[in-house]
Amino acid sequence: KAPKKKPIPMYLNALVVQNKDGKFLLEKNEDEKLLKGFWHFPLIEVDDFSQEEEINLFHQVSEESVNFGPSPEESFQQDYDLKVDWLDYQFDQIKHVFSHRKWHVKIIAGQVNDFHEFKDREVRWISPKEFSHYPFAKPQQKIWQGYERTYLDNGRQ
């Protein structure tokens, strides 16, 4: 019997974005084989999380490491056509192990004042009270719990 393969690490940013009505942006996973049909906070895959930390650690950055392309926040704003006020919060990293993948998820939170509905894809603004009507996979539940722990427990909403 072949030895069990170690899950491949994947690094993702979960963008937890709230509108002025207190609803959160969720998207239905339509195309992935993994977790198809579940609703999720927008996720952006990155190579790893070390790039950002390295920039903060060293004031002088070598020429070739300057251009990482758009940040996850910039990618999100382009993909969803929203102007987001990103919050400067440090959330606990979320980890979730599937049989063949290990997700490392960093939460990035933001708020929008001007928002729109999405006609072209399965994206909705949903209040936390309604979350139970939408199937969430376990990693998304962990993301929401991590968000609540840090953000809502600090008395902000």
What function would you assign to each model-found segment?
Residues 1-157:
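Intrinsically disordered, low-complexity, charged terminal extensions of DNA damage-control enzymes
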